[in-house]
Amino acid sequence: MSNLNKRPDWIKVKAPNSAEYYNTKDLIKNLRLNTVCEEAACPNIGECWSKKHATVMILGSVCTRACRFCNVKTGRPDLLDPHEPQRLAEAVQKLNLKHVVITSVDRDDLDDGGATHFAECISEIRKSSPNTTIEILTPDFLRKEGAAEIIANAKPDVFNHNVETVPSLYKTIRPGARYYNSLSLLHNIKKLSPEIFTKSGMMVGLGEEISEVIQVMDDLREAKVDFLTIGQYLQPTKNHAEVAKYVTPEEFKYLERIARTKGFLMVSATPLTRSSYHADEDFQKLKENYQQRHCEEAWPA
């Protein structure tokens, strides 16, 4: 597998420099919050923060796993911060967010994998910003009995868990996870709370075959997933997995067309697509697509 050092023009972005970007950065810093935008070196940080969109990362900034694609620090995590849910709710209120995305590191050291902390964050936001819709992007809660029930009972508007890549690459790219456990988690959340929209994403350009990507689409639809995101893998550092291919915009359009035939309510497939990219706008489209598909049914409460 060759290392493709030069990124093509279609995935180059401008460096952030707007006043709104720095305002968002200062607020996040002052409230002592972590964001996946910074920790994972997201290429869309300038655009999102300029719009006051940020994906907050709870449960600390140190992950218990070492996935080969991820730039988040790995090691021994800190103790849980009991005041984090309140600070997060304060940030949501100050930013006047209509839609918030909350993610986390993996916390295999916790009995519930951090599920209760997610639920507490949702509860605090509901108290101070009842009109804000909440999307959570969680780890897989591997071997954490009862975690799915805790999350489902917390009733986020969107539950997102990424399968990340095709099953054949799990041992090298996502060694601490199990593909079918991820599918099971997505399916269980939908089964426990059908009104929650479910979402999952994957990267391409890691050496997967097109046929494998299509099989993942089928598996996700079998798990009743509503929204699929597909984006280009970008190597964070030389210590991470190398890029096997830069997938062209035309190839992404092809994948999107195939995914739409599978029955997803929403599909986003572009080189710069990330799980939380345009999450606010996409949630509105998701609701509209649901209503169009179920025009004779009542909107779920």
From Swiss-Prot:
Keywords: 4Fe-4S, Cytoplasm, Iron, Iron-sulfur, Metal-binding, S-adenosyl-L-methionine, Transferase. It is found in: Cytoplasm. The gene is lipA. Pfam families: LIAS_N, Radical_SAM. Its EC number is 2.8.1.8. [4Fe-4S] cluster 2 binds at residues 63, 67, 70. Binds 2 [4Fe-4S] clusters per subunit. One cluster is coordinated with 3 cysteines and an exchangeable S-adenosyl-L-methionine. GO terms for molecular function: 4 iron, 4 sulfur cluster binding; lipoate synthase activity; metal ion binding. It comes from Rickettsia felis (strain ATCC VR-1525 / URRWXCal2) (Rickettsia azadi). Transmembrane segments: none annotated. It catalyses: [[Fe-S] cluster scaffold protein carrying a second [4Fe-4S](2+) cluster] + N(6)-octanoyl-L-lysyl-[protein] + 2 oxidized [2Fe-2S]-[ferredoxin] + 2 S-adenosyl-L-methionine + 4 H(+) = [[Fe-S] cluster scaffold protein] + N(6)-[(R)-dihydrolipoyl]-L-lysyl-[protein] + 4 Fe(3+) + 2 hydrogen sulfide + 2 5'-deoxyadenosine + 2 L-methionine + 2 reduced [2Fe-2S]-[ferredoxin]. Its cofactor is [4Fe-4S] cluster. It comes from the Bacteria. [4Fe-4S] cluster 1 binds at residues 37, 42, 48, 276. Residues 49-265 form the Radical SAM core domain. Pathway: Protein modification; protein lipoylation via endogenous pathway; protein N(6)-(lipoyl)lysine from octanoyl-[acyl-carrier-protein]: step 2/2. This is Lipoyl synthase.
